[in-house]
Each structure stands twice: as structure tokens, then as C-alpha cells.
Amino acid sequence: MKRRAWFVLLVAILIFAVSVVAQDSKKESQLRTVRGVVVDKGETPAQGGVVFLKNLRTNQVRSYIADSEGLFRFSGLDPNADYEVHAEKEGAKSQTRQVSSFDNRKEIVLTLKLDKKKD
């Protein structure tokens, strides 16, 4: 009888563990990514440009320094929030781009052009 109780307990634990993993992967698949490139006026990748991403619901701001190819990436974003994205480098600034919660794409790709003077 003890053996059977242990077996039932083990099966219950395994079922619970599998359901938790499935829920986590489902939640992960619902998250969104914003990625892209920062370029200067001449369309050259702007290495070291700082990209700012602001969650308009929480006002939380995340930043990312563009790599040697001007690339940036923000992942794990809430699909139910709106965001503003812009880049800055050495006194230049890009236009602020909007990412809407109504846009159902899981991955948003942007080109941020540094063409304005920073305020």
C-alpha cells in the first residue's frame, strides 16, 4: 500500500511540474521584442548610440547601448503596454517612435535615425 501511495504522489508531482513548465513557455511566447538599428544622417550604423525604451503604462525606462553594427534589442516586453523608443548619441537624437499594444506583432523592427539636435 505504501508503494502505491508513493507512486501516486510521484505521478502527481510530475503532472504538476509539466503543467508549470507549459504555463511558463506559453507566457514567454506571448511576450514581445523590439529590435533594430541606430544610424546617423548618412545611414551609417551608430555604434554606441543609446536607445531608450519607455513603458507608457509604468513609466519605466530601459536603455541599451547599440553594438558595433548599431544594433539594439529589448526582449521580454509586455504586449499589453504601449512604448516610446528613441536613440541619442553625441548631441543628436532620433525621432520618438511609438509601439502600440494594438500592434499584435511579436517582434517589432525599427530603424532609428539620428537626425535631430538633442533638446
Go through each PLM region and give its residues.
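Hydrophobic beta-strand segments
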Residues: 44, 49-55, 85
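Structural motif
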Residues: 35-46
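Short, acidic Ser/Thr/Gly-rich low-complexity loop/linker segments typical of extracellular
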Residues: 57-71
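Edge beta-strands of extracellular beta-sandwich domains
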Residues: 94-101
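Bacterial N-terminal signal peptides
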Residues: 8-17
